Swiss-Prot record:
Protein source organism: Arabidopsis thaliana (Mouse-ear cress)
Assigned protein family: Belongs to the caleosin family.
Function field: Probable calcium-binding peroxygenase. May be involved in the degradation of storage lipid in oil bodies, in abiotic stress-related signaling pathway and in drought tolerance through stomatal control under water deficit conditions.
Modified residues (Phosphoserine): S220
Knocked-out gene: effects: Increased drought and salt stress sensitivity. Delayed seed germination and reduced cotyledon opening and greening in presence of abscisic acid.
UniProt GO molecular function: calcium ion binding; plant seed peroxygenase activity
Name of encoding gene: PXG3
Tissue expression from the record: Expressed in cotyledons, hypocotyls, leaves, shoots, flowers, stems, siliques, hydatodes, trichome bases and guard cells. Not detected in roots, mature brown siliques or mature dry seeds.
Protein's name according to its UniProt entry: Probable peroxygenase 3
Gene Ontology BP annotations: (R)-2-hydroxy-alpha-linolenic acid biosynthetic process; defense response to fungus; oxylipin metabolic process; regulation of reactive oxygen species metabolic process; response to abscisic acid; response to cold; response to desiccation; response to fungus
Cofactor dependence: heme b; Ca(2+)
Segments forming domain EF-hand: 57-92
Cell compartments where the protein resides: Microsome membrane; Plastid, Chloroplast membrane; Lipid droplet
Catalyses which reaction(s): RH + ROOH = ROH + ROH
Amino acid sequence: MAGEAEALATTAPLAPVTSQRKVRNDLEETLPKPYMARALAAPDTEHPNGTEGHDSKGMSVMQQHVAFFDQNDDGIVYPWETYKGFRDLGFNPISSIFWTLLINLAFSYVTLPSWVPSPLLPVYIDNIHKAKHGSDSSTYDTEGRYVPVNLENIFSKYALTVKDKLSFKEVWNVTEGNRMAIDPFGWLSNKVEWILLYILAKDEDGFLSKEAVRGCFDGSLFEQIAKERANSRKQD
C-alpha cells in the first residue's frame, strides 16, 4: 500500500519527463483552490483575485479573451473588427490581414449558431468555448472557464532560464510538450497562438512573462497594450 509521500509524489523514477517538467505543490499557500476552474476571473499566485480593475462584464474568461476584438460590443467579431484589433495592438496592415484571415477562417464556423456557413466569417463570442482545440495548455476548460493550476504549471515546467518567464525556445517547448497524438489542427493552432503572443508581449530581453500570459487569457493584456499605444499617439 502506498504511503502518504508516494501518494502525493509529483515525479516517478521510471518516467524522467515528470522530473524534467516539474509541477508546484505549494500553490495553495498563495492561491486558494488553484485546481478550481474560475468562470469570471483569471487569478495566479501573485493576483489571487484576478486582474485588478478588469471588468468581466459577466463573460467567461475565454469570452473576455476574445471580447477585445468586438469593436461594437454586439457579441460578434467580424474580420474587419479582428483587423482593427490587431492594428490597435501595433501589427502592420499586412500582418493584421494575415492574422485576421487565419483566425476568422479557423474559428468562425465552429462558433456559428447554425449549421449554415456564413461568408462574412463572424466569430460568435457566446459560443467561443466551441473553438477550444486540442494540444493546448488546458488553462481554459471545455466551457471557457480558467484553471489557475494549469497556468502555473506552464511556468514550473518550462520556465527554466528565468523564473516565471519564457524564452522563445521555452515557448516552443511549451507547444511541443502539449502536443497530443493525431492532432495536426491543435499542433498548428497552439504554435500560432503562442508565437503570436510572444511577438506581441515579449520584453526587451526577449522573454514572455507569466503576467503577460495571464493577461492574454482574460484579455486585459490587449486592453493595456492598445491603451498604451493610443496614449503614445496622443503625445506625439
